């Protein structure tokens, strides 16, 4: 998994936001692995990197919690907004089935923390009406395939929508290396 973070507002983790995520882990009866905490800290500093860990060890939450912590830190003591943030995270994965699984995992954390974020998928299977809706108002996090992203990049409104993008995650990147799809 490759994670590219924005260096726009590099900073360190604030206790309150990280504590919210750590508490969520406790409710699941999980302990975050050191690599997850290290990933969150690196994200807070605006660093990019590669997450390499065995299947089932929490790479998704390692990459996902960083942008959420960053957003909660930015929010500070302000009241929770009712409207979701604009597109901040682009999550690219090569397999449609993985798009569904990833979207479910990302939504779980957002819903459990009661954050106003929207997490949506966009693949060749996504209906035209949903794609049209997304082009008018992108979700906070878009989970997509390389092919759907290529098409999306051809639309003029995408440049504006991507202007607030803070994090790009390329999941299962090794699946793309030996194909025409590329990374």
For the regions a language model picked out, list residue spans one by one.
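N-terminal intrinsically disordered, low-complexity tails of helicases
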Residues: 1-38
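Conserved P-loop/Walker A NTP-binding site and adjacent catalytic elements of P-loop NTPases
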Residues: 22, 30-183
């Amino acid at each position: 998994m490759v994670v590219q973070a924005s260096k726009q507002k590099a900073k360190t983790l604030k206790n309150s936001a990280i504590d919210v995520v750590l508490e969520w882990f406790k409710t699941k009866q999980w302990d975050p692995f050191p690599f997850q905490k290290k990933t969150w800290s690196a994200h807070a500093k605006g660093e990019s990197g590669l997450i390499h860990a065995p299947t089932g060890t929490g790479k998704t939450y390692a990459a996902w919690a960083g942008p959420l912590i960053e957003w909660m830190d930015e929010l500070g003591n302000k009241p929770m907004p009712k409207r979701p943030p604009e597109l901040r995270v682009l999550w690219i994965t090569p397999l449609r089935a993985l798009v569904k699984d990833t979207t479910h995992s990302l939504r779980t954390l957002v819903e459990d923390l009661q954050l106003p974020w929207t997490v949506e998928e966009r693949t060749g299977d996504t209906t035209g009406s949903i794609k049209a809706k997304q082009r008018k108002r992108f979700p906070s996090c878009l989970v997509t395939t390389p092919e759907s992203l290529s098409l999306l990049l051809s639309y003029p409104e995408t440049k504006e929508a991507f202007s607030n993008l803070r994090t790009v995650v390329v999941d299962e990147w090794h699946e793309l290396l030996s194909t025409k799809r590329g990374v």
